[in-house]
Structures are given as structure tokens and as C-alpha cells.
Amino acid sequence: MKRIFSIVFLLVALLATVSAQYFPVDTARLNSAYKVLVSGNRTLETETEFLAAYPTTWLEFYMTYSFVDDENYDYSMCEMCCEHISTLFSLTKVSDTILCKKIVDLTVGMKETGECTSFFQDYLIGYILSEDKLVLDYLSKLKKGYQMEFWQFCWSTVTECGRAENFKKLYARNKRKYPEQMKMSRIAFQYFYDGINYPELFPYKDEEYNRKFENKDYKYNFDDYIDYGGD
């Protein structure tokens, strides 16, 4: 009897561990903090609580909001992803430097996986353009690999789009004051703008990409495509 009880206990503990892996943050705390903010109660304390509850790393973000094709999977957090993102970028009471650190740290290593990350990317680009000094000052303190991972996500797109204009604006404005950052940003843009597919399409399931890939005469001339506004 004791042996059976021990086996059952171990199975329950294992299932609890596996389940917890999907939600590495306290989702009850996060949702509660979100509801307080959307109710109109915006103070330093309520915004700090939301920021503290929100994922801090890309892995936490992915495990909290990712879509898993399983009928038994709880999609409640996946469905709240965009609302939580817009709330994160709307915080005004917390310290600018604290919010900046949270956003940059979260972005490092992030991958374009679909609607949720695309939504985050839209807000991120707007944030960088409005708070470029703050972002670049903090980013410059990180290891170069982390800096490149940050820029990689910023400019990752599956097609050509308005991101090119965002890049040109940021580059022209900061190329002299932050030359190293803009060098990395330029390299990341060169390789990741219109340079990826969503994970489910990787590596060569996109027909248009296949045609380009199979065409030996096709060459993407990056320097002709983008105008940096001078060196």
C-alpha cells in the first residue's frame, strides 16, 4: 500500500512540475495586477506590481503566452498576450530606467513566432524611437552578443514592410552618437529584415522563397535597397 501511495505521489508531483513549466510566472498575480490597471487604478504601486509580475526573460514570456496545439492546453494566457503587452508599454508611473531595463531584458533572445511576438515588436519599435537614448545607453552596457540578439528581434520580419523606414530613422538619428550600436543594428537589419520565416514554415516551405532560392540569378542587393542617409 505504501508503495502504491509513493508511486501515485511521484506521478502527481511530476505532472505538477510539467504543468508549472508552461507558466513560469505567477499568472494569477499577473492577471490580478492587469485587472487593477485596466479598472483605472493607475498608481506607482499598481504599475510596479504589474511590472514585477510580468515575464522578465524571453523564455518566461514564451512559456507563459505560447500557443500549444493541444485540446487540453489552457489558452487563457495566450489570449491575454496582446492586452498584457499594450499594458506593459503604457506604464507611465514607474521609473523610466526600470521600465527600459525590463523591456530590453525581455527582448534579448526573443524570436518572431507569430501574432504575440509581432504585436510586441510593433510596440517595441515605437518605444525605441521615442526613448532611443534611454534604450541605447542601457543596451550599450550589455554583452555584445545580447546586444545583437536585441537588434536581431527588432528587425526580424517575414516580408518587406514599414520596418525599413523605422530603421532608417533610428540609424540617421543615432549613427554619430552611438556608432557601435548602429553598426550592430545595421548588420541585424541586413540579415533579418525580410530574412526569416515563422517556425512552422522553416526552412523552405514558403513557395515564393523557394523560387528565389532556386533561382541562381537572384541576388538580394542590400546596399542598393536601403538608404542610410550618409555614412
Language-model regions: role of each:
Residues 4-15:
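Sec-dependent N-terminal signal peptides
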Residues 21-231:
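Non-catalytic all-alpha helical scaffold/repeat segments
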Residues 16-20:
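Sec/Tat signal peptide C-region and signal peptidase I cleavage site
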